[in-house]
């Protein structure tokens, strides 16, 4: 995260901050917000991690390359998904390709091959995605439509929670994949 943060600061012309991270203990989410005025650090408890339920968002995915606090598309997606009884929503591009969820990177299994939406869709090059690429071998990047995800085993990831299986997509049960458990176990060194 630190490397991505510093690279984004360089590209966006923001002075690199000196970060002193809190020491709240294990299972904490630490958030650094950096602006031209300085940096703020916050932390919160991780909470329980369980399989997630996803729905498709009506909000279109707008490409971005840096993790910034302007997250309107993701906030609207997450709010609508939770109102619908799901944990998160999947955003589609204007061309109808699945991009990512509001707080998760998305992957699907095609046999023993792990696939992910291409970074070229303008999704964040997530730290968790890089870790999964180390563990699963190179991810196969594929453009996929919502219909093409039906019946596939799905997983999501983020740096706070690691690898998490998807239990339901649009209210339909998602099949499990044995390789998911191996990724979950190996994600945290």
Where are these regions (language model features)?
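Short internal beta-strands
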Residues: 115-119
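Short conserved beta-strand segments at catalytic cores or DNA/RNA-binding microdomains
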Residues: 105-109
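Conserved alpha/beta cores of soluble small-molecule-handling proteins
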Residues: 1-97, 110, 120-123, 129-189
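Short beta-strand/strand-turn micro-motif
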Residues: 97-104
């Amino acid at each position: 995260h630190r490397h991505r943060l510093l690279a984004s600061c360089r590209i966006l012309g923001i002075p690199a901050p000196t970060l002193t991270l809190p020491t709240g203990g294990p299972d904490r989410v630490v958030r650094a917000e950096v602006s031209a005025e300085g940096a703020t650090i916050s932390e919160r408890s991780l909470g329980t991690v369980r399989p997630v339920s996803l729905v498709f968002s009506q909000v279109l995915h707008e490409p971005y390359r840096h993790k910034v606090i302007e997250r309107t598309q993701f906030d609207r997606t997450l709010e609508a998904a939770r109102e619908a009884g799901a944990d998160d929503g999947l955003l589609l591009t204007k061309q109808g390709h699945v991009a990512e969820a509001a707080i998760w990177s998305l992957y699907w299994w095609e046999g023993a091959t792990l696939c992910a939406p291409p970074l070229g869709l303008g999704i964040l090059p997530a730290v968790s995605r890089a870790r999964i690429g180390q563990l699963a071998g190179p991810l196969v990047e594929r453009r996929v439509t919502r219909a093409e995800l039906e019946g596939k085993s799905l997983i999501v990831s983020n740096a706070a929670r690691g690898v998490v299986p998807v239990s339901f997509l649009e209210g339909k049960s998602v099949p499990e994949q044995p390789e998911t458990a191996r990724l979950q176990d190996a994600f945290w060194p």
